[in-house]
């Protein structure tokens, strides 16, 4: 009998990651979160298997947005009826729904649209402040996930 039969549960166990979004570029942070939610950082990754981890993001209200994206980047919504195309700038979206929705849309756009999309997005917890209720569950913590010198210079105030 093989000794590996009962050990697959450890490989598929969900690890909790804590990421601080303070002064981190939105796109870089979203791509790293999407990779973690999919499980691409694990050696057992398979596109059809749900082997990703849980991600808790804090300090989302201080996320770094460079350039004039706040005024120029547009979000669209269409109801399906003729003439009902709505558009918002990133600044209007942040004022109306908060910075959490900006990050959630960015991460959701980087995940593949398949049957696992909803399950992966439910494992993403986003908070505006530094406090969150999952401190006991956190296994890995990243306070500056992007170590680019350019990002540090762009968002230092």
Curated annotation (Swiss-Prot):
GO cellular component: mitochondrial large ribosomal subunit; mitochondrion; ribosome
TM region(s), chain numbering: none
Keywords noted in UniProt: Mitochondrion, Ribonucleoprotein, Ribosomal protein, Transit peptide
The organelle targeting sequence, given as a residue range: 1-29
Superkingdom as given in the UniProt entry: Eukaryota
Subcellular location: Mitochondrion
InterPro entries referenced in this protein's UniProt entry, alphabetically: Ribosomal_uL13, Ribosomal_uL13_bac-type, Ribosomal_uL13_sf
Cited NCBIfam families: rplM_bact (TIGR01066)
Subunit architecture: Component of the mitochondrial large ribosomal subunit (mt-LSU). Mature yeast 74S mitochondrial ribosomes consist of a small (37S) and a large (54S) subunit. The 37S small subunit contains a 15S ribosomal RNA (15S mt-rRNA) and at least 32 different proteins. The 54S large subunit contains a 21S rRNA (21S mt-rRNA) and at least 45 different proteins.
Chain's role: Component of the mitochondrial ribosome (mitoribosome), a dedicated translation machinery responsible for the synthesis of mitochondrial genome-encoded proteins, including at least some of the essential transmembrane subunits of the mitochondrial respiratory chain. The mitoribosomes are attached to the mitochondrial inner membrane and translation products are cotranslationally integrated into the membrane.
Protein name stated in the entry: Large ribosomal subunit protein uL13m
């Amino acid at each position: 009998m093989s000794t590996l039969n009962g050990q697959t549960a450890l490989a598929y166990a969900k690890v909790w990651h804590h990421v601080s979004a303070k002064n981190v570029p939105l796109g870089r942070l979203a791509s790293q979160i999407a990779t973690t939610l999919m499980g691409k950082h694990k050696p057992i990754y398979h596109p059809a298997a749900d082997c990703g981890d849980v991600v808790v993001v804090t300090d989302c209200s201080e996320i770094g947005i460079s350039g004039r994206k706040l005024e120029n980047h547009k979000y669209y919504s269409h109801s399906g009826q003729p003439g009902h195309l709505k558009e918002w700038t990133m600044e209007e979206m942040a004022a109306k729904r908060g910075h959490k929705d900006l990050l959630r849309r960015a991460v959701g756009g980087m995940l593949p649209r398949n049957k696992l999309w909803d399950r992966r997005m439910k494992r993403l917890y986003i908070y505006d402040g530094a406090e969150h209720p999952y401190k006991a569950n956190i296994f890995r913590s990243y306070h500056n996930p992007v170590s680019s010198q350019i990002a540090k210079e762009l968002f230092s105030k």
